[in-house]
């Protein structure tokens, strides 16, 4: 039977000093026999997805205490990718994932916490916490702050839904009035919560639900709705229960690595493909799988992408639906339920409820459940009131979206396409693979050829787009923006969004060894591996080259001869120390970012640290 880890600091005469310090935090004699549960919060006044989490932390701590645990809260950092976007701040976003994972390991291991509950929400915070939980492998529960309500504006006497991406698109249109832009800007992000589309934050919160480390509703129940409070309370109760199950009953099934096994990762990826989630999720799942010691690679994702239909299309891939609409249609469990009816899922994976997936779907799929509380939860909708307060409104839809032919979630029979919403492409330009969100592309553009225009920074590319230097048929190549070359693998939301501003998003493509925001759509291919800084072929592309993209065949090809390619390699290598480095770019790189670049692997490995380098230190 495992002993509480915390007994290292709470038991025995030689720990009297530690107990004295614990007492100074408010603990009493009775607390020294209870499990110490780390409440890993990510509250921040910088981030709308995290602005409400201070109150959430207090609620969860109180419930843990009531349930028989000792709650000890600490904070991680949190970067808002939307605010950091389009300038040097984005260099820090992806590296913060590793910093978050490390900081959790430091605090939890230094204080010998027995378990942890992770209060996350936005882009790099959820994956950083996920990596930490799988690394530490102690009882863990995830609960996100919840998605933001969609923004709304009046246009042509109609109310239309908008989000952050709409604000960026219109900001890049020179003919749009300042007053209209201000109206959109003031309306796009009306409440606390993670941005309202199926961007990276909401995608990751949906995936933790599918993996089994978060409760049903985690990914889609609005931050502002009163039902979210119930989810926080239940999550706090469950972390105490599974902690006691592990330490008092030796139930190892509740440990993160036993929940997040290979089949669970595949279920999560199948969900991701079915809903056309953010391409960043692939990066984060690959990283998390390495922490879990699970053999899950790009090749596994490629196989899944060919058999999973695309059954849910949400902003930015459509303006019709946001995450609040996914919730009304049954949420993550609704999407998984449709995949399950086509026998596509691993049904024996288990979760923090200690149910297998089949049992969970029986209870939480709106087409299967007999539980009125479940139906009631999925009726939770937007209040339409600007607020930064958590669980502050109680609006409910009178009926759910059961339309599986034309609704927000479709059946596999009525899928948008039988080929999923994400795809992996290979070719001489990406020998180790690259990623495209097919959910955001018109079928007529699945096969695309164009002329390369090469840039060595996203700033340079964005400027060219706005200055009218890009024309239909161009393929913008942005290189040296990978994990090592950036460093930090910036998101290219501004260039792709400016293509929309210039009405070029359907007639141009953009490829990069960087990555994309979850808000990106169009012919946008990222994560090209190897990256330019790792001697990838993208470093050898020249202006005027023809690039061929074929999504049905899963290929991307630089249309030059092998002889020419060999010549370019020799040409680049002749530059000596200056080879495979950007030459036209001026960028300050801090020592922290240099350290990240030194240890980072390419995107096909999740942009995690190269442990071979670490082992040689």
Swiss-Prot record:
Keyword set, alphabetical order: 2Fe-2S, Amino-acid biosynthesis, Branched-chain amino acid biosynthesis, Iron, Iron-sulfur, Lyase, Magnesium, Metal-binding
Catalytic residues of the enzyme: 517 (proton acceptor)
Signal peptide: none
Keyword Signal annotated: no
InterPro entries named in the record: Dihydro-acid_dehy_C, DihydroxyA_deHydtase, DiOHA_6PGluconate_deHydtase_CS, ILV_EDD_C, ILV_EDD_N, IlvD/EDD_N
Cofactor binding: number and manner: Binds 1 [2Fe-2S] cluster per subunit. This cluster acts as a Lewis acid cofactor.
Binding residues for Mg(2+): 81, 123-124, 491
Any one annotated GO CC term: cytosol
Superkingdom: Bacteria
Ligand binding ([2Fe-2S] cluster): 122, 195
EC number: 4.2.1.9
A biological process from GO: L-valine biosynthetic process
N6-carboxylysine modification, residue list: 124
Pathway assigned in UniProt: Amino-acid biosynthesis; L-isoleucine biosynthesis; L-isoleucine from 2-oxobutanoate: step 3/4; Amino-acid biosynthesis; L-valine biosynthesis; L-valine from pyruvate: step 3/4
Catalytic activity as recorded in UniProt: (2R)-2,3-dihydroxy-3-methylbutanoate = 3-methyl-2-oxobutanoate + H2O; (2R,3R)-2,3-dihydroxy-3-methylpentanoate = (S)-3-methyl-2-oxopentanoate + H2O
Subunit structure: Homodimer.
PANTHER family in alphabetical order: D-XYLONATE DEHYDRATASE, D-XYLONATE DEHYDRATASE YAGF-RELATED
Similarity comment: family membership: Belongs to the IlvD/Edd family.
Alphabetical list of HAMAP family matching this protein: IlvD
Function, as annotated: Functions in the biosynthesis of branched-chain amino acids. Catalyzes the dehydration of (2R,3R)-2,3-dihydroxy-3-methylpentanoate (2,3-dihydroxy-3-methylvalerate) into 2-oxo-3-methylpentanoate (2-oxo-3-methylvalerate) and of (2R)-2,3-dihydroxy-3-methylbutanoate (2,3-dihydroxyisovalerate) into 2-oxo-3-methylbutanoate (2-oxoisovalerate), the penultimate precursor to L-isoleucine and L-valine, respectively.
Listed name of the protein: Dihydroxy-acid dehydratase
